[in-house]
Curated annotation (Swiss-Prot):
GO terms for cellular component: cytosol. Keywords: Cytoplasm, DNA-binding, Transcription, Transcription regulation. This is Probable transcriptional regulatory protein MYPE8020. It comes from the Bacteria. One of its GO terms (biological process) is regulation of DNA-templated transcription. Its main location: cytoplasm. The lineage of its organism: Bacteria, Bacillati, Mycoplasmatota, Mycoplasmoidales, Mycoplasmoidaceae. GO terms for molecular function: DNA binding. Belongs to the TACO1 family. It is found in: Cytoplasm. The keyword Nucleus does not apply.
């Protein structure tokens, strides 16, 4: 998997203000706790939401407040994933959490129209992504052989179901290693790798592109405006695409 995936995955974060991101993270925690209960060990969605919140510096106090607040919250939110196409066949997945689906879909249609794209049928875009746990590790003072040795050691420490392949992919980049794991082993493998002294830069269970689309400057500018609109929309939780790089 090329390095440009790691660059593209950062676009959304750079454009999102910390306050806006914090609100979206808190909203997901509250919704996850309300649907699946307040215990993250028994609620995978809540566990993932807390993990992402901590990585983005949301305080433990705020996390607890939102978990506890979910019990008394009378609002009813519906979560959905929308798929769409952008310029040059760009593929996009959008996660929403909304109390008004009609408002949400109307807004998304407007964003896609300005992008010169369109909303797609369900599951027509997701075949360009895999859903897995991505672990990004610093390669400072770490060779590929060292990494593979530590991965094998970590696998010895966890219980693996027959026929499962916990490690889906490993890739070496200029300044980091990328490991993609099966979601159900994500937390255990990450914990073991941390215990073995590896420096984890970033980690998340997410959709990861399997192929990429490059855009010219004009189309890339449209994509940036599209992301700005999505990031400012309180109904939109996240956006991911298979954007590769800008071409002249």
């Amino acid at each position: 998997m090329p390095r440009k995936h790691l660059i593209a995955s950062g676009i959304n974060k750079k454009q999102q203000t910390q306050a806006k991101l914090g609100n979206k993270l808190a909203k997901e925690i509250k919704a996850a706790a309300k649907v699946g209960g307040p215990n993250p060990e028994a609620n995978p969605r809540l566990k993932a939401a807390i993990d992402k919140a901590l990585q983005n510096n949301l305080s433990k106090e705020s996390i607890e407040k939102n978990i506890n607040g979910s019990i008394k919250d009378p609002s009813s939110l519906t979560d959905a994933e929308y798929e769409g196409y952008g310029p040059n066949g760009l593929r996009i997945i959008i996660k929403t959490l909304s109390d008004n689906d009609n408002r949400t879909i109307s807004s998304l249609r407007g964003y896609f129209s300005k992008l010169k794209g369109e909303i797609a049928k369900p599951n027509s875009v997701k075949n360009s992504f895999i859903y897995g746990g991505e672990i990004i590790i610093s390669n400072k003072d770490l060779t590929e052989d060292d990494l593979m040795e530590k991965i094998l050691l970590s696998l010895e420490k966890i219980e693996v179901t027959d026929n499962d392949e916990p490690i889906q992919e490993t890739n070496q980049h200029e300044d980091c290693f990328q490991i993609i794991v099966m979601p159900k082993y994500f937390y255990k493998i990450r914990q073991e790798l941390e215990t073995l002294g590896l420096k984890i830069i970033e980690s998340e269970i997410k959709y990861i592109p399997t192929d990429y689309v490059d855009l010219n400057k004009e189309d890339y500018a449209r994509l940036e405006r599209f992301l700005d609109s999505c990031n400012e929309d309180d109904d939109v939780q996240w956006v991911i695409s298979n954007f590769g790089e800008v071409i002249e």
